[in-house]
């Protein structure tokens, strides 16, 4: 016995059903679609109908909601920052622009520094949020933290100010005046 003499077991491989190839084939003329009507024509698909039964899209409840003004916060661990510094992708000063390019994020994203990992050298980090453990580890390594108030997109939209200054500019808090009924 050799490889050239191997064959599949009898009945294991069926021939492909060739539809619409003459009446002698058994699947000619109407090609298994019955006689005339919309269902026999090309392009027909059965509608999502379950007869008299309540359809699934009405049996299942609606749920969930996506906030239109949600903040997309990207987590960045200290271990990632240490790795970037080892590989030469980041210097001892990490800004929001650096984080955007390193994390392949959008300009409208926020960044949160998390405390997973250790820092070997002092780092100056600018981010939107910092966890307590990350803050302790950065300060322990001799680094500094600066919290940004705005996203890159918001900072770029401020006229006559560089992006670095725009990031630090606090947002104006709008307070509604209460109407006093008299």
Swiss-Prot record:
UniProt keyword terms in alphabetical order: Ribonucleoprotein, Ribosomal protein, RNA-binding, rRNA-binding
Task: Please note every region of biased composition (Gly residues).
Answer: 21-35
Region (Disordered) residue spans: 1-52
The record, for InterPro entries, names: Ribosomal_uL15, Ribosomal_uL15/eL18, Ribosomal_uL15/eL18_sf, Ribosomal_uL15_bac-type, Ribosomal_uL15_CS
- What is any Pfam family matched here? Ribosomal_L27A
Q: Which residues form a coiled coil?
A: none
Among Gene3D superfamilies, the record links this protein to:
3.100.10.10
Extract one GO BP annotation from the record.
Answer: translation
Gene Ontology cellular-component annotations: cytosolic large ribosomal subunit
Asked if the keyword RNA-binding belongs to this entry, the reply reads yes
Write out the GO MF terms. rRNA binding; structural constituent of ribosome
Instruction: Relate the assembly described in the record.
Output: Part of the 50S ribosomal subunit.
Name the family: Belongs to the universal ribosomal protein uL15 family.
| Function field | Binds to the 23S rRNA.
- Protein name, as recorded: Large ribosomal subunit protein uL15
Q: What is the organism of origin for this protein?
A: Chlorobium phaeobacteroides (strain BS1)
What is the phylogenetic placement of the source species in the record?
Answer: Bacteria, Pseudomonadati, Chlorobiota, Chlorobiia, Chlorobiales
């Amino acid at each position: 016995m050799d490889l050239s003499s191997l064959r599949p077991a009898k009945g294991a491989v069926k021939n492909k059903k060739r539809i619409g190839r003459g009446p002698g084939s058994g699947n000619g003329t109407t090609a298994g679609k019955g006689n005339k009507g919309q269902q026999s024509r090309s392009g027909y698909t059965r509608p999502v109908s379950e007869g008299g039964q309540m359809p699934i899209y009405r049996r299942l409840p609606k749920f969930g909601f996506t906030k239109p003004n949600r903040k997309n916060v990207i987590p960045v661990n200290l271990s990632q920052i240490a790795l970037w510094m080892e590989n030469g992708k980041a210097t001892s000063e990490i800004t929001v622009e650096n984080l955007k390019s390193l994390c392949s994020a959008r300009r409208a994203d926020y960044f949160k520094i998390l405390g997973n990992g250790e820092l070997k050298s002092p780092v100056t980090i600018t981010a939107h949020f910092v966890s307590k453990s990350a803050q302790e580890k950065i300060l322990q390594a001799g680094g500094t933290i600066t919290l940004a108030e705005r996203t890159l997109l918001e900072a770029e939209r401020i006229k006559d100010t560089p992006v670095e200054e725009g990031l630090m500019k606090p947002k104006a808090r709008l307070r509604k005046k209460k109407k006093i009924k008299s």
